[in-house]
Regions:
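Surface-exposed charge patches
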Residues: 8, 98-99, 168
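Phosphate-handling DNA/RNA-contact segment within nucleic-acid enzymes
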Residues: 33-142
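TOPRIM fold recognition
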Residues: 86, 102-195
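Generic recognition of cysteine residues
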Residues: 23, 76-78, 152, 186
Length: 195
């Protein structure tokens, strides 16, 4: 019922009020009653909540971040488009689709959080391929109409490494577009804070 702290936190992060309101109306964002965390909800085709990510709204110290126990990564947080779309943008974290939507202002594509990525530490040599993200594979299985995947991972070593591997894994079947934030070391949520 009361999402005041989530509103204040996301507005402070530069997220557009209309984006926040739309997410709350859709039931994919709310404020937890106990600790006032922002709760990003992933739903299945029937509208049943299957995934939740908690993000602390207090801005001092290290922020609290955790997936809710029992969350199913096949149904990570996702912003739907206004109309049918054959485009999908993918992000590392739940706040990033909101931030990128705020910056772009377009609702012409699905915006899916992968619920994090795996990448080796910078400087370590690895020829091992990245496992395909569960959230992405499951989304594509449910949405055979998708033709384009826009990779919007962070512009840091891990994000670029993941982008390379995701592009390699899905090219040929999908049109791949790389759209990392222009600023080195940033994600889209960092860019909305700077506006």
């Amino acid at each position: 019922e009361n999402n005041r702290r989530v509103f204040a936190y996301l507005l402070k992060r530069g997220i557009d009020r209309k984006v926040i309101e739309a997410c709350i109306r859709a039931g994919i964002l709310y404020e937890s009653a106990d600790y006032h965390n922002a709760v990003f909800v992933g739903k299945d085709e029937t509208g049943t909540a299957r995934y939740a990510f908690l993000r602390g709204t207090y801005t001092r110290g290290n922020p609290f971040k955790a997936e809710v126990s029992g969350s199913d990564k096949r149904f990570c947080f996702c912003l739907p488009p206004k109309r049918e779309s054959k485009k999908l943008a993918i992000y590392e974290a739940a706040i990033e689709p909101l931030a990128h939507l705020t910056l772009e202002g377009t609702t012409d594509k699905w915006r899916l959080s992968l619920g994090g990525i795996y990448a080796p530490e910078e400087g370590t040599q690895t020829s091992r391929d990245m496992k395909k993200p569960i959230a992405l594979d499951a989304f594509l299985a449910r949405h055979p109409e998708i033709e384009e995947i826009e990779i919007c991972t962070n512009n840091d070593f891990a994000g670029r490494w993941a982008a390379d591997h995701i592009e390699k894994a899905y090219q040929g079947k999908y049109r791949m577009v790389r759209n990392l934030p222009e600023k080195e070391g940033c994600d889209y949520a960092d860019l909305t804070k700077e506006r």
